[in-house]
């Protein structure tokens, strides 16, 4: 299906945030930053929050309500606004229905959705499938790439199939609680234990002795029944963004680096949730201090990873730079957009400011439309 015809004037963008995942608060913070930076001369914004139990709510979209304040994380509640529904009918593409005690009120249709959702039930293909069914264009990757990019098992399977450099890992499916001797010897110590379909370092543990493994697996399983145990990769943490333009052209951003080890007592080098969002305990170098040939290789690998997963619109690819070269760690199909997030910073370093970056994403989504492609 092609994109809807646009009436003269501004494009109506629904920014959807919150959601049912453990990354609810970070999604809210990302949305606040996006709401603050969407060009009001080009875009009319509709802010839609999703509560932790899955209710859709039309909010006032004030960015100041979506910030971390004195360590308190923001959240969407049913009191945040009017409950909404999105009819899954292409003949009503973008139509919103405000729910109430009566029959409901039909609201003006949106032209495009910006799903600023991190983690399961948002970044994993679920809302993308809903929007495809409803015939509403949306920012970011489609159903398959979103699902594959969210699941660390399948991300690495697809990257490996394309011959891209990845680290070693073992998947613990439901009912499997530990590693066997061969797996322990293969991975070595330390290892990182993660929910297979999670982000923002939530539920992640660094294990330095095998007797710590059961507790780490139990923590990860609070967020996902499928758990990943990754071999530690010794190297610098680098990131690179990929952006698709309306004409289908792909570009890679300036390369950035995250430095944690030795910063404010974080000698373990573990970039966890608190370090990312609460303690301001990481140093971000944009551009990264690497040789030009290394930066070029990172940028090329980022585009190859983007293509291997089948991404669209945007993604951030995370690397370790080892003595033997770059290793791809993860791909994020909807990276963070907070004030400290690397994705907008890396593009700004290359000359694309935040409002221009957001406009390019929306324009690409509209040009792409929905349906098989």
UniProtKB/Swiss-Prot annotation:
Domain ATP-grasp: 156-363
Major location (coarse): cytoplasm
Organism: Mycolicibacterium smegmatis (strain ATCC 700084 / mc(2)155) (Mycobacterium smegmatis)
Its job: Cell wall formation.
Gene Ontology MF terms in the entry: ATP binding; D-alanine-D-alanine ligase activity; metal ion binding
Cofactor(s) listed: Mg(2+); Mn(2+)
GO cellular-component term (any): cytosol
InterPro entries per the UniProt record, alphabetical: ATP-grasp, ATP_grasp_subdomain_1, D-Ala_lig_Van_CS, D_ala_D_ala, Dala_Dala_lig_C, Dala_Dala_lig_N, PreATP-grasp_dom_sf
Classification via PROSITE patterns: ATP_GRASP, DALA_DALA_LIGASE_1, DALA_DALA_LIGASE_2
The protein, known as: D-alanine--D-alanine ligase
Cleaved signal peptide residues: none
């Amino acid at each position: 299906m092609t994109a809807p015809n646009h009436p003269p004037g501004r494009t109506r963008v629904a920014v959807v945030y919150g959601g049912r995942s453990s990354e609810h608060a970070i999604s809210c913070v990302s949305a606040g930053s996006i709401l603050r930076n969407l060009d009001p001369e080009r875009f009319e914004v509709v802010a839609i929050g999703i509560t932790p139990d899955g209710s859709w709510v039309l909010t006032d979209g004030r960015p100041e309500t979506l910030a971390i304040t004195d360590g308190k994380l923001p959240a969407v509640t049913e009191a945040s606004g009017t409950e909404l529904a999105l009819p899954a009918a292409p003949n009503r593409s973008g139509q919103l229905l405000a729910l109430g005690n009566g029959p409901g009120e039909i609201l003006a249709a949106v032209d495009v959705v910006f799903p600023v959702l991190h983690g399961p039930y948002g970044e994993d293909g679920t809302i993308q499938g809903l929007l495809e069914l409803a015939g509403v264009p949306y920012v970011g990757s489609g159903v398959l790439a979103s699902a594959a990019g969210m699941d660390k098992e399948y991300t690495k399977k697809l990257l490996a199939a394309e011959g891209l450099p990845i680290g070693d890992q073992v998947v613990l499916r439901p009912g499997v609680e530990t590693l066997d001797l061969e797996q322990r010897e293969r991975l070595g110590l330390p290892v990182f234990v993660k929910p297979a379909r999670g982000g923002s370092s939530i539920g992640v543990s660094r294990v330095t002795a095998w007797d710590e493994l059961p507790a780490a697996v139990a923590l990860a399983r609070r967020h996902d029944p499928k758990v990943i145990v990754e071999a530690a990769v010794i190297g610098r943490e680098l990131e690179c963004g990929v952006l698709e333009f309306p004409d289908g052209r792909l570009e890679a951003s300036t390369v950035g680096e995250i430095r944690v080890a030795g910063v404010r007592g974080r000698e373990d080098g573990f970039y966890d949730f608190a370090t990312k969002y609460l303690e301001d305990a990481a140093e971000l170098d944009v551009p990264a201090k690497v040789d030009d040939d290394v930066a070029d290789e990172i940028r090329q690998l980022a585009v190859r990873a983007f293509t291997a997963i089948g991404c669209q619109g945007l993604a951030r690819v995370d690397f370790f730079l080892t003595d033997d070269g770059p290793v791809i760690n993860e791909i994020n199909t909807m990276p963070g957009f907070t004030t400290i997030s690397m994705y907008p910073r890396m593009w700004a370093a290359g000359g694309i400011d935040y409002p221009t970056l957001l406009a390019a994403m929306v324009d690409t989504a509209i040009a792409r439309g929905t349906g098989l492609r």
